[in-house]
From Swiss-Prot:
Gene3D superfamilies: Acid Proteases. Its main location: secreted. Probable aspartic-type endopeptidase which contributes to virulence. Residues 1-22 form the signal peptide. The active site is at D110, D292. This is Probable aspartic-type endopeptidase TRV_05382. GO terms for biological process: proteolysis.
Length: 401
């Protein structure tokens, strides 16, 4: 994993909570709709930017630049990818609280996967350290001969058994949900102590359980909703919202612009018809991209990233850190993606992702990939209201109100 002369590893999770989780805004039984508000936690963990890039590239099976691979896979005194900070320098993280059986865990809602996997009591004790744990032996029913595995080319991953158990998100319970209980995780997963697993909102046929694929949590509640949709209204430096079964028109401006979804690979994938960097429009550049709430960065074609960073004085592709960087005191230009006639504008401040510790250099929230499809992650989503509609399927986009 990563290493640097100017930080000390800090593995202990020292978070505290500052916002309670919102319960459903209405009774699902009578309205077919409900809302989840992300939970804000303050933690003394600070992610190293190249490590976060490594996570996104690895998840989407993209080639790793040598520097990113070296930083992410080096196992040494700084192997956990965190830096020590003082109490006044804590980070804020936004997570989603879920109850499985009698256990409460923090998970990522992830449109880029269809697996519902969590840290469990079946892991070795060292892998459970600083995580909230699911205890399937207390409330779950094991699915015989059903297993799962997530693996990447660099040797990282997770694997385990499958149990049926009740799973409740924002008070809405699925009484018999397939939960993928980890029996093994690589140390890179174990070191991510802010969350305890993933609840995938991709398509059911992308689920990784074998020999019989299992329904996602959303797949199990979809028929109980007013409409087969969920929306994401994620925020920059604030808790965001997921709405289920309806479109909250108070959260967006204007009419959403829709694109058809190609779900053949299980992703929320579509084709965009252009982009803008600063005042430069490129309305004929079409590219495919996956919309992924579980990835921090937006991983875009090299032609787009090079054009964007060419507008920023002092920007460079930093080979030591494996990505595009720039002076932290720089005011970044806007970036936009064209969706039919709608330009989805990303403010420059959303692209200034993080300062590299010990320097005056910041790491960009837009980074390059050479292979299609691209990935639109948090740096894009935190300015947009996005509709994920299983009727079609299709996605709608509008500016946040």
């Amino acid at each position: 994993m990563w290493h640097s002369p100017f930080f000390t590893a800090f593995t202990l999770f020292l978070g505290f909570f500052t916002l309670t989780l919102a319960l459903p805004t209405n009774s699902l039984a009578t309205t077919g709709r409900f809302t989840v508000e992300q939970r804000l936690i303050k933690t003394f963990e600070s992610n190293w930017p190249p490590k976060e890039l490594w996570r996104g590239l690895r998840k989407h099976h993209r080639p790793l630049p040598p520097a990113v691979s070296r930083i992410a896979t080096h196992r040494g005194p700084s192997a956990n990818g965190t830096v020590k900070v003082t109490p006044d320098e804590y980070n804020t993280e936004f997570v989603n609280e879920i109850t499985i059986g009698n256990n409460t865990l923090f998970v990522d809602i992830d449109t880029g996967s269809s697996d519902f996997w969590v840290f469990s009591s079946q892991l070795p004790e060292r892998s459970q350290l600083n995580h909230r744990i699911y205890h399937p032996e207390k409330t779950g029913t094991k699915l015989s001969k059903q297993i799962w595995e997530i693996g990447y080319g660099d040797g990282t991953g997770a694997a385990g058994n499958v149990f049926l158990d009740k799973a409740s998100l924002a008070g809405l319970e699925v009484p018999s949900q397939a939960v993928q209980a980890a029996t093994w995780v690589s140390y890179q997963f174990a070191d991510q102590t802010v969350t305890d697993g993933v609840i995938g909102f991709g398509f059911d046929h992308f689920n990784g359980v074998t020999p019989k694929k299992q329904k996602t949590w959303f797949g199990n509640i979809m028929e109980r909703l007013e409409k087969p949709i969920f929306t994401a209204c994620l925020k920059h430096k604030a808790p965001g919202f997921y709405d289920f079964g309806f479109i909250d028109r108070t959260k967006h401006i204007g009419n959403p612009s829709y694109l058809p979804v190609d779900n053949s690979r299980g992703w929320w994938e579509t084709t965009f018809n252009g982009f803008s960097t600063g005042r430069n429009d490129n309305s004929t550049y079409r590219f495919r991209a996956v919309v992924d709430t579980g990835t921090t960065f937006s991983l875009l074609p090299r032609e787009i990233t090079e054009q964007y960073y060419s507008l920023i004085t002092g920007s460079t592709f930093d080979r030591e850190n494996g990505g595009w960087t720039f002076p932290c005191n720089t005011t970044l230009p806007e970036f936009a993606i064209h969706i039919n006639d709608y330009k989805a504008i990303v403010p420059g401040e959303h692209i200034n992702w993080a300062q590299i510790p010990g320097t005056n250099t910041c790491f960009g929230g837009i980074q390059s990939v050479d292979r299609s499809p691209a990935v639109l992650g948090g740096s894009f989503l935190k300015s947009q209201f996005v509709i994920f509609d299983h009727d079609g399927p299709k996605m709608g986009f509008a500016a946040q109100r």
